[in-house]
Amino acid sequence: MMRDNEGTLWVMTNSGGINYMSKQSKRFSTYSLSLTGMEKADKEIGPFCEDREKNVWVGTRNGLWFFNSQTHSFHEYFLKKSNIKYDIRSLLLEGDNLWVGTYAEGLHVLNLKTGNIKSYTYSRDIPNTLCSNDVLSLFKDRKGEIFVGTSWGLCRYNPQSDNFITVINVGAMASVTDIYEDMYNNLWIATSNRGVFCYNTIG
């Protein structure tokens, strides 16, 4: 659920598509995913966020879509020229960059102004890569640091060296599904079956 800068309330569902209610109408309307050309798998709506141009980006199990605030229509966005439809699991807007986390295909950073894309993947042979290619959660703390939750643990992006530092390694079958920051600079890390971890970003 999200309220955009125009006051529109967006409600994304697992199988019922995209619902929205503007400040003026006070009633919910639904974007029919079948009418936009989306396939059945696209009805499984995942993460979403709003960019500086008031466009709403939506991740699905079968690709990345965005809602054009000028034309009030949805469009599919391919992260690669080969028109590969990634399984999008997490989104984070950071300035002009849209961070896109996928299942099994790593992390992709899209510059919304230039259209350039930088991709990051896990490699056992290269140090300081992602913990895993399953990027399930993305979070920017109040200091501006970006944390990446994966199916093997939590890592932090290092902009100076353009790589990643492992913060918490929870191992297999314990995906980092959500990240929350409290007023004491603690990050609360929710996992799929290992409980909750607390990480202090100061100490």
Where do the model's predicted regions map?
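Carboxylate-rich, polar loop motifs that coordinate divalent cations or form catalytic acidic clusters
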Residues: 1-203
